[in-house]
From Swiss-Prot:
UniProt family annotation: Belongs to the Mg-chelatase subunit H family.
Classification of source organism: Bacteria, Pseudomonadati, Chlorobiota, Chlorobiia, Chlorobiales
GO biological process, alphabetically ordered: light-independent bacteriochlorophyll biosynthetic process; photosynthesis
Protein name: Magnesium-chelatase subunit H
Annotated catalysed reactions: protoporphyrin IX + Mg(2+) + ATP + H2O = Mg-protoporphyrin IX + ADP + phosphate + 3 H(+)
Gene of this entry: bchH
InterPro entries hit by this protein: BchH, CobN/Mg_chltase, Mg_chelatase_H_N
Length: 1272
């Protein structure tokens, strides 16, 4: 009797197919023992899986693409005692290389197909690179017909190909016969092998049809007999996997039937996965479909297999989806998660990658999760299917409705209310933007009524129409009655809301006891509304987004009124950002119980968003179902000098040029310098050190003033669709070009080197670093190089002069080096492209019009304009994030290494040679995307590790660097993550967690491994290993924000203990590895007690640390928490790293803040630029004053002179005060109020006379505001 063979099949992403494999096992039971494993078994390194692999006679593997899993699999093979036959398909090269079929093996790094086969496959698709994988599939069928002609010496390759052919037709019967073929050919089993039963590689399907349709024509003909004429109606296409159709098609049938029940005509199309784009391009393009829904996830081009060449997929998808020009959605069930996991945690990191991250690069929008696993089978949720159907109908309605009949809702913000923030958004002039949008819509044929003559008038109209105090009893005001409210909200929703906010209408905007006020401005078919506040001002604990929280009655009424009463065809949120997408619910994979989905799931949603924030835009896309329309950031400018600063700079320059004022007047000049420096409070910024020569002090003070003068600032706001001034474009492009480099040579360094000025400097970064330290030669060289770069950019790119001649001119006769010519030519080309994109910004408004027509706008990466250049241009695209598997990038790791080494060197120099034991680092999702992972690289380097790459170029894990190579101890790192990082980078968190655990397990002494030291201490105190190795903390799942900023803005705190307690409560959820946000307050506070330094990166020029509240509420609060728990010292330094320009700056928070206040808040160039934007600009000034108080609350780092100068600039100057009161009375009231609050809390020691004057001004402003309300 023949030996019973053991076959182990390992198939990735196959958890949904338990029923299929049970059937296959049963059918094969007489022939062999079959064990079926999944990628999860490899990931968890299950002992049962190890045994099955070692004991198998044959191993069959497919869809395994993680190096760690392959490495473990190979370990099991190496421990086996028997020879194995190994078939591996559709997996990473490291896996494919393990194939062993008789004498046939796959060469490492190859895909398994001989080169000749690849060439033939490419011929079959007419040389299209993007169709190469599809060509292989076509070739497979052709080759099967000629296999009998293959000579016996190629028998093993023939068998390998035949086995793959069976696998590509994955019915249970074909899979059983595949295994029987293996048994017959390699184990002499006497089994009968049936021929392959073929199914078309792609086609159309309907659950009511008896057979598959091999083309569109036959499907349309069949449909016509059923009364559906696809040529005379709107229709959508549904793409799904052929494999699922053959094996587990219930969810496909349910989706098709639900769509048809809602009256949607569907082209249900199946593909193997690699040829989805082929079907769209060759079959659907000519059918003029109105919507494309991809149920497969992954990329449209190449599917799970990706593309054959870098850039090929991007080019092909752009061509196809732009040509198709319809909305593109992804909707699919969870194939690797059960319902319990989904409803508790949202979508797993693995599924996030192919459901969200990859499709977003194609421009996919409005993702809907349709179901999950139950007992090894995909089960759909009817409510989710209905959501897909409703959205599909609304998208198609948007396309079908004429512009004159379309109703569009434009939503702006006012948070927190009462502070002059109505109709403001980050970086955007909202009133002017609104008017420009209305003017363009009018040209496009929309009914916009009678437009106001100016942005100011439009704001006045909107302000009055949304003012609760003025309008609540006006008959023309928009309100919702109790009866209507009961129609708009379901009984279950009302029950949840009433438990939180009491009975309708609640305490927010009630009109009597039977109505709630919405307000808003109607202009023809356009509605402009102000998003309701989150909760009750002054009580931030009511605002916390825990899972039990809900929107209040006015909030749900507002969005339901827009979607159902106003019956909007489209909803547009204007600017970054509102609150609705941050409402309670799952992080991803939202259900109808999640408030963002409940509020936004009934109307096509568009979001005008700055191109520099792809991380927060991801929340709007994934939770808010939004299509992003990006806009550029405001123009950049140099801060310049003002008031007495230019005179001091001249005095310092004169001192330096006269060789340190040698002669009789030396003491007088020195006294004049010190007097002016003290008058300007510059001795706080740049104090003279003990025993420091005066000439050295002058050099440091001079370079500090030059830094202030040349600091990049945004001193205006962007108007959607408009271009910035020429000078700003020159500055932006110059900074971008300076960031570029090749072979260690940047443009500034090439100029210096070619001009003969280099001397002993090895790089421009070295020159910049030395100049900041006061090195006289480096100062002069840096100034010369900066001017040379600017002139080169202006003359070659803007004036279009000959680059060779300009190069010679700026270098004083130097010739452009031959080896640098290709690099210089490339940056000139990039600069020219940037000029085109920045000078003609019409793409923004054109894209908005396009999406309102129901069309497709291209996707594009978001990021920093200076750092990324043309990569983020043109604006007006549907911005997306980055590939989490390639973080940090090689460049980011190099720069992160420099930052980490600089931090350690700085600490050692300041602490008598002692290394830091723990550094707390804030890591934001936005920073990670913009810098491609510099902050992550800092963590890796501090811990003494480096990335390990697989054959695809993905980072599989981080390897510990040997201590003898590292040359210092491993530093422990407490990572304070943003919730967006938590949502977007689950894979990265797992990799960082493994690094911590590897370091904790390393056989190294405590004095050389502080991670191990701290973990061992925690274990000795009774913590388990998971708790002891927790290093990544942020808010609980589904929660966003520390709320320290809200507590400060609402003045709802008494002392720093209140702020600290809130920070700890909100930020003690641990992540990474198996952690899913469990509270780990004990280890967090223990780690905080060991923190020696806090570090945070500033990722771009648009937002400095004084410009937004996130900095003080995260890294500022983190420093506060460390300071209150560290028993060794309270002097915990907070460092900010600026790496967005060509050199890296590392400064303490107090210095960074002084630079910010001097270059912006107190700088006429900045505030006059803001005031040109009227109401919005005044609101921006007011925000900065609130944030200043926030900084002082958590760090005590705002000097009295800053408060005094702020009061003198804005409140005590009658002319300025009146300007602000005219533009935005609530803004100036907030400015004065914050001054008084700072004094009242003891933060600002001011003269009593100044306080009394401010009190009088505040009372007068209050009276004026009350009088304005009374006038109405």
């Amino acid at each position: 009797m023949a030996q019973r063979r053991k076959i182990t099949a390992i198939v990735g992403l196959e958890q949904y197919n338990a029923g299929l494999w049970r059937k296959i096992k049963s059918m094969l039971d007489k022939d062999a023992e079959l064990v079926q494993l999944s990628d999860v078994d490899l990931e968890k390194q299950n002992p049962e899986a190890a045994t099955a692999i070692r004991e198998a006679d044959c191993v069959f593997m497919s869809m395994i693409n993680f190096k760690e899993q392959i490495d473990w699999f190979k370990e099991q093979l190496d421990q086996a005692i028997n020879e194995k036959t190994i078939f591996i398909f559709e997996s990473m090269p490291e896996a494919m290389a393990l194939t062993k079929v008789g004498s046939y093996q796959v060469t490492e790094g190859k895909s398994g197909m001989p080169d000749m086969v690849k060439k033939i496959a490419k011929m079959l698709v007419k040389g299209r690179d993007e169709d190469a994988l599809y060509g292989y599939m076509k070739l497979m069928k052709i080759m099967r017909t000629i296999l009998p002609l293959v000579p016996n010496k190629a028998k093993d390759f023939k068998n390998w190909l035949m086995v793959y052919s069976y696998w590509l037709q994955p019915t249970p019967e074909n899979i059983v016969n595949m295994f029987r073929l293996i048994l017959r050919e390699y184990f002499d089993s006497n089994v009968k092998v049936e021929p392959i039963v073929d199914v078309p590689n792609m086609g159309l399907y309907h659950p009511d049809a008896k057979e598959y349709f091999k083309d569109v024509k036959s499907f349309k003909s069949w449909s016509k007999k059923r009364g559906v004429n696809f040529d005379k109606s709107q229709k959508m296409a549904l793409l799904f996997f052929r494999k699922h159709l053959l094996q587990e098609k219930t969810y496909i049938d349910n989706t098709i039937r639900t769509l048809e029940k809602h009256g949607v005509n569907v082209f249900p199309a199946f593909v193997m996965g690699v040829e989805g784009h082929v079907l769209v391009r060759d079959w659907l393009m000519k059918e003029k479909i109105d919507l494309l829904v991809n149920m497969m996830g992954f990329g449209l081009v190449g599917g799970p297999a990706g593309s054959t060449k870098p850039g090929t997929a991007a080019d092909a998808r752009h061509e196809i989806l732009t040509g198709l020009d319809v909305p593109y959605m992804v909707a699919q069930p969870l194939l690797v998660q059960d319902f319990e996991s989904w409803h508790e945690l949202g979508v797993s990191p693995m599924q996030v990658t192919f459901t969200y991250s990859i499709p977003e690069m194609d421009g996919a929008t409005a993702p809907v999760i349709l179901g999950a696993l139950q007992d090894g089978k995909v089960e759909t949720v009817q409510e989710r299917l209905d959501r897909l159907a409703i959205l599909s109908k609304k998208w198609m309605r948007l396309r079908a409705t004429s512009n004159r009949d379309k109703r569009v809702a434009l939503v702006v913000y006012d948070y927190p209310p009462g502070l002059g923030k109505k109709a403001t958004a980050a970086l955007l002039d909202v009133p002017t933007t609104l008017l420009r949008i209305l003017e363009r819509l009018k040209k496009e044929g929309y009914n916009v009524g009678t437009l106001p003559e100016s942005p100011t008038k439009l704001f006045e109209m909107l302000d009055r129409a949304t003012d609760y105090q003025i309008m609540q009893n006006k008959p023309e005001a928009i309100k919702v009655s109790r009866e209507k409210y009961n129609e708009l909200a379901t009984y279950h929703e009302r029950e949840r809301i009433e438990e939180r906010w009491q009975a309708f209408p609640g305490e927010i905007a009630p009109v009597g006891s039977e109505e709630v006020f919405l307000g808003g401005l109607r202009l023809g078919n356009i509605y402009i509304g102000v998003q309701p506040r989150l909760g009750v001002q002054g009580d931030p604990m009511r605002l916390i987004f825990d899972k039990a929280n809900t929107p209040h009655h006015q909030y749900i009424s507002f969005y339901r009124w827009i979607s159902r009463e106003f019956d909007a065809h489209a909803l547009v949120h204007v600017g970054m950002h509102g609150s609705v997408e941050w409402m309670p619910g799952l992080q991803t994979g939202l259900t109808g119980e999640c408030w963002p989905d409940a509020l936004l799931g009934e109307v096509p949603h568009f979001y005008i968003y700055p191109v520099n924030n792809p991380s927060e835009s991801t929340i709007a896309k994934r939770r808010g179902l939004a299509t992003m329309v990006s806009h550029v950031v405001p123009p950049l400018a140099r801060a310049g000098l003002y008031k007495e600063l230019p005179a001091l700079k001249d005095l310092l320059a004169d001192y330096r040029e006269r060789n340190q004022a040698q002669g009789e007047d030396v003491e007088q000049v020195q006294e004049a310098i010190m007097t002016k420096a003290e008058l300007l409070n510059l001795t706080d910024d740049c104090p003279r050190r003990p025993d420091e020569p005066f000439s050295d002090f002058v050099s440091r003070l001079y370079i500090y003033i030059v830094e202030l003068e040349n600091r990049l600032i945004s001193n205006s706001l962007h108007v959607f669709g408009e271009a910035g001034p020429l000078e700003s474009q020159i500055i932006t492009i110059t900074e971008t070009i300076k960031n570029r480099g090749e072979n260690g040579r940047s443009l500034p360094y090439i100029f210096i080197d070619t001009s003969g000025r280099n001397g002993h400097y090895g790089s421009y970064e070295e020159i910049s670093s030395l100049s900041r330290k006061g090195d006289e030669a480096a100062i002069q060289l840096r100034e010369w190089a900066e001017n040379a770069c600017r002139e080169f950019v202006k003359q070659t790119m803007f004036d279009r002069k000959n680059p060779m001649q300009v190069f010679e001119s700026v270098t004083g006769g130097g010739r452009m080096p031959e080896e640098d010519k290709p690099f210089i030519q490339r940056i000139i080309q990039e600069g020219a492209m940037m000029i085109q994109a920045l000078s003609d910004n019409s793409s923004e408004m054109n894209s908005l019009v396009k999406v309102l027509d129901g069309g497709y706008i291209p996707s594009g990466p978001g990021g920093d304009l200076v750092r990324d250049g043309m990569n983020v241009l043109p604006s007006g695209r549907n911005i997306h994030s980055i590939d989490p598997w390639r973080i940090p990038s090689e460049t980011a790791f190099k720069r992160g290494t420099l930052i980490a080494d600089g931090l350690i060197s700085k600490h050692v120099a300041e602490n008598d040679g002692q290394y830091p034991e723990t550094i707390a680092e804030v890591i934001w999702g936005l920073d990670t995307i913009k810098t491609k992972g510099e902050a992550v690289a800092v963590v890796i380097r501090l811990m003494g590790a480096e990335p390990a790459y697989d054959a695809f170029g993905k980072i599989s894990h981080y390897n510990l660097t040997p201590l003898d190579k590292l040359g210092r101890p491993r530093v422990d790192v407490l990572m304070q993550l943003s919730p967006i990082f938590r949502d977007a980078f689950g894979i990265l968190m797992d990799q960082l967690d493994r690094l911590v655990k590897d370091a904790a397990k390393a056989d190294e002494p405590h004095e050389m491994n502080f991670i191990k030291k701290h973990v061992d201490e925690a274990l000795a105190e009774g913590m388990d290993f998971e708790a002891a190795t927790s290093r990544q903390f942020t808010q609980a799942p589904g929660a966003y924000g520390t709320y320290v900023d809200d507590m400060i803005e609402d003045s709802a705190w008494e002392n720093e203990g209140d702020l600290d307690d809130l920070f700890i409560r909100r930020n003690s959820s641990a992540y990474g590895g198996g952690r899913k946000g469990e509270k780990q307050s004990e280890i967090l506070q223990k780690l905080l007690g060991s923190v020696d330094r806090v570090v945070h990166q500033v990722d771009s020029t648009e937002f400095g640390i004084s410009d937004i509240d996130h900095y003080f509420s995260s890294s500022g609060s983190l420093q506060l928490a460390a300071r209150r728990r560290n028993t060794k010292t309270s002097d915990i330094k907070l460092n900010y790293v600026e790496s967005f320009t060509s050199d890296i700056k590392l400064d303490e928070a107090d210095k960074s803040l002084r630079v910010e206040y001097r270059s912006k808040l107190l700088n006429p160039k900045w505030f006059e630029g803001m005031l040109k934007h009227g109401h919005s600009g005044a609101g921006e000034i007011s925000n900065r004053v609130t944030y200043m108080l926030g900084w002082d609350a958590v760090t005590k780092s705002v000097d009295d002179w800053v408060y005094k100068k702020t009061a003198e600039t804005y409140a005590l100057d009658p002319e300025m005060r009146e300007r602000l009161a005219t533009l935005n009375p609530q803004a100036i009231k907030n400015i004065v109020g914050r001054m008084l609050e700072a004094h009242g809390r003891g933060m600002w020691k001011a003269d009593q006379s100044m306080i009394e004057e401010l009190q009088e001004i505040y009372a007068d402003l209050e009276d004026r505001l009350e009088g304005m309300a009374d006038d109405d």
